[in-house]
Amino acid sequence: MGIIDKIKAIEEEMARTQKNKATEHHLGLLKGKLARYRQQLLADEAGSGGGGGSGFEVAKSGDARVVLIGYPSVGKSSLLGKITTTKSEIAHYAFTTLTSVPGVLKYQGAEIQIVDLPGIIYGASQGKGRGRQVVATARTADLVLMVLDATKSEHQRASLEKELENVGIRLNKEKPNIYYKKKETGGVKVTFTSPPKTNLTEQAIKMILRDYRIHNAEVLVRDDQCTIDDFIDVINEQHRNYVKCLYVYNKIDAVSLEEVDKLAREPNTVVMSCEMDLGLQDVVEEIWYQLNLSRVYTKKRGVRPVFDDPLVVRNNSTIGDLCHGIHRDFKDKFKYALVWGSSAKHSPQKCGLNHRIDDEDVVSLFAK
């Protein structure tokens, strides 16, 4: 029996099994097996070297990467053409984009790479179409922009979320608060900081570890709301990606005002119409907000700060991160920094490598 057949058999057994107290451990074991087989399927495909095709991979560049994911002909290519400095082939039929097309969104002094991926197809997690290559690129994103057709949004969103979930991409989720360490000896030790309120029991943890052939490990569950699914994610951590997702509903000109209002009120959501140029600026502003970037202006001694060419860093970055962004060896030569702005207690403040900088701070760096 091949891996795809095994996956199908487990999914069918899970569908047949009633969810209750008596079956929750059995279902948890099936979920663990399913996660293992899906990962094996993706690893086999990646190792086979097939399917990528010319131009599929795009080198990561700029201050952040955003990937556009959606079904064919939902308006991804149109959106890319409207907000970036590139052109993606556009047509009114499915599968126009056959390779990943990059563009650059210049906003607030930052250069944000936007990648229009081939239209993802239902069944990517079982090896259908080019979905596997699409999700492999999505794993490298700082933000997923899920573009949906407002006239078909409910079905599209649910199926895309399921596909991404199946291949280990977790949208708008935090890593489970579980400490897990594989050991050489000592057996399995499980500790809960408070009694679990879910199906994640000590027995379930030990059953799943046994199925993964892990006989020595330390597990500390710090959150009483963690589930079996969360624990499976923890032991498969190297194959899990926790990515922010912004849901963009296109073609709002084709639905009622009531429906537009309902969609717009959902969290992490923007509504727009590419054809009518409605809501495009809202999309750009929300991308900037979700990426949570900070601009830092540099200043040389005796010279005014450079305000038209900021260094862009992740929010909550330190002076050390800033130095590394300039050059990886710069930290070794670093002496001190002078900081003006909201992160400084007084202006200027003399700071070391661990000082956290805020958006629009001005920084002077001094070397030894």
From Swiss-Prot:
Pfam families to which the protein is assigned, alphabetical: MMR_HSR1 (PF01926), MMR_HSR1_Xtn (PF16897), TGS (PF02824)
CDD domains attached to this UniProt entry: DRG (cd01896), TGS_DRG2 (cd17231)
Example of a GO cellular component annotation carried by this entry: cytoplasm
PROSITE patterns per the UniProt record, alphabetical: G_OBG (PS51710), GTP1_OBG (PS00905), TGS (PS51880)
Subcellular location: Cytoplasm
Annotated GO biological process: cytoplasmic translation; positive regulation of cellular response to amino acid starvation
Gene Ontology molecular function: GTP binding; GTPase activity
Protein name per its UniProtKB record: Ribosome-interacting GTPase 2
Species lineage: Eukaryota, Fungi, Dikarya, Ascomycota, Saccharomycotina
